[in-house]
Amino acid sequence: MRLTCLALTLALAAPLPANPVLIRETGPLTPEEELRGFSVPDDFEVQLFAAEPLINKPINLAWGGKGRLWVSSTVEYPYAAKKDRWIDERGSRVRDSHDAIKILEDVDGDGKADKVIEFADGLNIPTGVLPWHRPEHKDGCIAWSIPNIWYFADTTGDGKADLREVLFGPMGYERDTHGMCS
């Protein structure tokens, strides 16, 4: 019995490869190469609307009523910016953050984005965006950006959010930055 346990222990303790390859490494692909890798039903077609440099690390997107694509992008993810980088106590802007909500538009009608507006900048992992605005504003959206759910609005018509209003929050995010806008 002891010999069987010893043999079993030694067999299970056999050395494993130090760094098993779990994911096949590949170099970066162009958007066109990525498109060729899609598998879609016969009646479907995939078209490229936007790629880098217009967008970078998109995390959420939604089409607005004016036919424009609203995209939240984050460089901070998965680590939220600490409070010492917040511009104010509400967390309305983060110093040195490249997280933003951008609006992409097809101006010339060729089916591809050719205009991008950085609508709201200095955000903190904006994982949700819903294009919507009050009638008195030119444009706007409801978005989650740590630590609140915000209403961002363009009140002047320059394409930039000059109003940042907390709708709900603040909410805890210290343990997990996922799904706060669910």
In which residue ranges do the predicted regions lie?
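Beta-propeller domains with acidic blade repeats across secreted/periplasmic ectodomains
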Residues: 15-182
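Bacterial N-terminal signal peptides
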Residues: 2-15
